[in-house]
Curated annotation (Swiss-Prot):
This is FO synthase. Its cofactor is [4Fe-4S] cluster. GO terms for cellular component: plasma membrane. Residues 84-336, 544-785 form the Radical SAM core domain. Coiled coil: none annotated.
Amino acid sequence: MPQPVGRKSTALPSPVVPPQANASALRRVLRRARDGVTLNVDEAAIAMTARGDELADLCASAARVRDAGLVSAGRHGPSGRLAISYSRKVFIPVTRLCRDNCHYCTFVTVPGKLRAQGSSTYMEPDEILDVARRGAEFGCKEALFTLGDRPEARWRQAREWLGERGYDSTLSYVRAMAIRVLEQTGLLPHLNPGVMSWSEMSRLKPVAPSMGMMLETTSRRLFETKGLAHYGSPDKDPAVRLRVLTDAGRLSIPFTTGLLVGIGETLSERADTLHAIRKSHKEFGHIQEVIVQNFRAKEHTAMAAFPDAGIEDYLATVAVARLVLGPGMRIQAPPNLVSGDECRALVGAGVDDWGGVSPLTPDHVNPERPWPALDELAAVTAEAGYDMVQRLTAQPKYVQAGAAWIDPRVRGHVVALADPATGLARDVNPVGMPWQEPDDVASWGRVDLGAAIDTQGRNTAVRSDLASAFGDWESIREQVHELAVRAPERIDTDVLAALRSAERAPAGCTDGEYLALATADGPALEAVAALADSLRRDVVGDEVTFVVNRNINFTNICYTGCRFCAFAQRKGDADAYSLSVGEVADRAWEAHVAGATEVCMQGGIDPELPVTGYADLVRAVKARVPSMHVHAFSPMEIANGVTKSGLSIREWLIGLREAGLDTIPGTAAEILDDEVRWVLTKGKLPTSLWIEIVTTAHEVGLRSSSTMMYGHVDSPRHWVAHLNVLRDIQDRTGGFTEFVPLPFVHQNSPLYLAGAARPGPSHRDNRAVHALARIMLHGRISHIQTSWVKLGVRRTQVMLEGGANDLGGTLMEETISRMAGSEHGSAKTVAELVAIAEGIGRPARQRTTTYALLAA
């Protein structure tokens, strides 16, 4: 491969050797590398000091690990040799404006310079499509969207350009352009727009098979110290960038990340960066490739005089990346930032992917470094003993995994370009095809599950992808252990003193006093329950209320990855099903005939549910039974609908209200504390978004219930914090109709089966939670509901004597708790609910969803 003009081999001094990196320590680390042992952070930093024969030894170990991974993945080329992959791409620099000031960057500019160059603030749609069309003619499969971070946050010109064209953000424009590229050219977008939130990535996933963001470094020193590489760049905060990696994992997005080598980081910081990537991938399995990129100084930047990364330093880092990240990770090095000889050396150090290489567009981030010609790169790869094969923007294992990783709205575009046997790219030119929402969901699968769950039970004990759907169980158990360590061993506040305080002002105690009440046992617990029962009597009297309703869980297809949930199935599982809109309406009519005043509709987050699906269900029920109260869609379902529609939360909720939605269930809350929440669930909405959705629903006239699921990995301090969140919302909106404590049903829960959760709450926990809720919510939420489905009749009666006043509903069918292993049935008649109340000497009364009492 000829050396391009101006391309010099890198030959610079090695970084300062860490004090611990003496010869004997290095020999020990190299021996561990030869033995296939994963290097810890200190060992990785020491290994990066290897030079000469030691470096050759290190690279040989890394190459063996790489080859083992390629063999395991079946990654062979046309000649039968192991294969190194690349993606044939076009580079689309959507905008060169950015709110950051990275000291090494020439990609980013300012509006004045763009104007002087005669360039637009953003690439116009026609420009983007022209590049993509020409790329398709060259056989490119990937459209790399690269741009600065949130330019509209800094530049008035960016805000004006977007506003004139009807976009509220750069990411909205990127999404629209990705759809146009898919539809008009068939190229697959790979989105690299910098830092994104959970909601933003949720919105972008349906238009791109993969996304990416370089972690670069975990060094806070480089971020916080004036004059260093990332100072003055808010989006280069390592904590923020690690959060992006985590959110991408929670959303099951095939994600590219990596590190920059030689921007002023120490070897220990470099090693820590690799381990941070390893930890994120271990938990979620979503990091599809790690780019190890060598720093190249550029003229007219603050770091123009900073030395390039030395080649031995670079090779050692690549080798260590391979050893830390293991055989299954694709390790990538940009071939245009090194010479041909150095490319061969990188292969020897464990590289197995060249990343995106364009036969058409320059590397706009490194414009002084042209891409090697593809035939030249293939020749270099062959000289190193490997075939070079073309892949898609998503690595093969994610392509072949299907709906678990690739959204169905872009799945067809991926399938059109993928070899079904390997997941690599087919030798075809892309062709545009429609990007559209799925059609109406048809009825299929075990649609009788609601009725059959009580007589026939489940067909399978667990869903088919139990081993892969929820992330790494070892990592999850470590998080549970950390939660347990932080749980208080004793309560300093005296329970009797807390009781006296609660008697004087139930809603005015300190958190410490509430925690004391929550941990009470024995006679103290009896006193807490008695106080709660007294408050109940004062607020709502002795009547036990209930609603005649029907649960309609319209689908159990879900890929969110809630680790506590035994209801969710993947498509094709023996217990999986979806109801058609017509079947849902039929069940609402059946409920009406049986005397129901409410249907409660919730379902899994099925990626094939059309954007109109939620409103269609509401309209169908209202058309069949105009008087039926529709209580439907958890905040997670609302977040999903908002993501699909592109509307704001407020706009989408108003649309549902106009379709006939009456109230929403305040489910999907679990525990409103993210340290617990991210153990319980992989991909569910974060606490802040749950609060925003519920608050907005109340503001547009959609009242809701409120809930808390307890008895898994939580502790009493989480109960207090959760109830405080609900109190704050109620103070602002007054929109909660009731509070429903939901005991964790453990029997079939993946989290419990993996040994990470308790076997549900104890009887003490149940009594304490119901009583605590009555006390803490006094004066704010009058109705405390207890779940006969989860507790059974006798324990339900105990809760009614300790603060609760409501039995929930008749349900008619219930699949969520029953699939989790609840043994208390899925339906109660009115007579049976009345009998529960009369069994403790209390009258029962039917109510509406919003607690208006109905005539006896």
